[in-house]
Amino acid sequence: ELENFFSEKPMDSLLYSIAINNMEKRNATVLKQFHELITENSFVLIGRCGNYIYKNDEDVTTLFIHSDMDSKIERTMHKQNMDRIKAKELIEYVDSKREAFHKRYTDETWGDARNYQLTVNSSVLGVEQTAEQIIAFIDKKHR
């Protein structure tokens, strides 16, 4: 199950249906194992419910970077060498999987600004300025 967590894949739906009553206990176990596994050193965690797992850790900065759909499509078309329709389909598919994964393990809404210390719209600032704003936020927070 920890392997499924790292790959952001929900458990088999049949197993999930059978074991629904034990969901909270299992989720707590997976999240605890994950927390113990990577708390030894400084690190950057992208996804995998990091905002939830580390929400009580003072040294942690949680952030969510989002973008408008047109910017996502343009970036995906360029990086994945695909047309607009396929890029949009891929984005919608990946985002729906991320949303379901986050909901499954945290019962929170993925991307909800209330669950992060900082949210940034990278389509407004661009990649470079987004990175600069994140660095400035972290520097200010940890002074």
Predicted ranges, named:
Residues 36, 48, 52, 64, ...:
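Long, contiguous binding/interaction regions
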Residues 52-58, 111-113:
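Short loop/helix-cap segments at secondary-structure boundaries that form the rim of catalytic
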Residues 24-28, 43-47, 99-104:
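Short gly/ser/thr-rich secondary-structure transition/capping motifs
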Residues 1-42:
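ATP-dependent small-molecule kinase phosphotransfer cores
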Residues 20-27, 95, 109, 124:
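Conserved phosphate/pyrophosphate-binding and hydrolysis machinery centered on Walker-type P-loop NTPases
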Residues 56-80, 84-92:
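Conserved phosphate-donor/acceptor-positioning beta-strand/loop module used by diverse small-molecule
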Residues 35, 107-143:
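NTP-dependent small-molecule kinase module
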